Amino acid sequence: MQPDLSPQLAMVLNYIRHFIDINGYPPSIRDICKATGLRSSSTVYNYLNKLEEKGYIRRDPSRSRAIEILTPYPALTRAKNMVSVPLLGKITAGQPILAFENIEDVFPLPADLAGAENAFMLHVSGDSMIEAGILDGDYLIVRPQDTAENGDIVVALLEDEATVKYFYRYPDHIELVPANSSMQPLIVHKVTILGKVVGLYRHFS
């Protein structure tokens, strides 16, 4: 991420770059709203103004779709098979997963690794999934979906807290099972599924 940009601005800039590389022309305001989850066109205009003030883009107010990228960027982020994946912080019940206030950073990842253009990443805290090879400090790549099959590793929301567990549905209850033999399953009757874990990124220090 560019050091002088917030995660939100970086995500908008990366989306514009990606859209231009794929289509050969800039996105519309509506395109940016849809891709980033922003509901207000005025908010998009505000972000574009900030990017222009910082020298990242140039716009022609007399023409629509007139956004020009001014700053160079690594070939990796320009590749047509790359997607910008947001790293989320706290996930709150009743709030869209990709709400901009949840985004801590943005990472360019190969589309095959991300699994979906709307994928997101979460930072793992704890050792409840160590026997599945998911360690404290790892970054999980998650495909948003609200359903799951038995045996899927999911991100679920329980009482305003996100948890990563194996998912199993039974006739009278749901079990969220840790991959740690020292821990017990969580037995619930209702749960909100936020997504399925489709990949993992680990940094070796």
From Swiss-Prot:
GO terms for molecular function: DNA binding; serine-type endopeptidase activity. The keyword Protease does not apply. Its EC number is 3.4.21.88. GO terms for biological process: DNA repair; DNA replication; negative regulation of DNA-templated transcription; proteolysis; SOS response. The keyword Flavoprotein does not apply. It catalyses: Hydrolysis of Ala-|-Gly bond in repressor LexA. The record marks A93, G94 as: Cleavage. Residues 29-49 bind DNA. Represses a number of genes involved in the response to DNA damage (SOS response), including recA and lexA. In the presence of single-stranded DNA, RecA interacts with LexA causing an autocatalytic cleavage which disrupts the DNA-binding part of LexA, leading to derepression of the SOS regulon and eventually DNA repair. This is LexA repressor. It comes from Moorella thermoacetica (strain ATCC 39073 / JCM 9320).
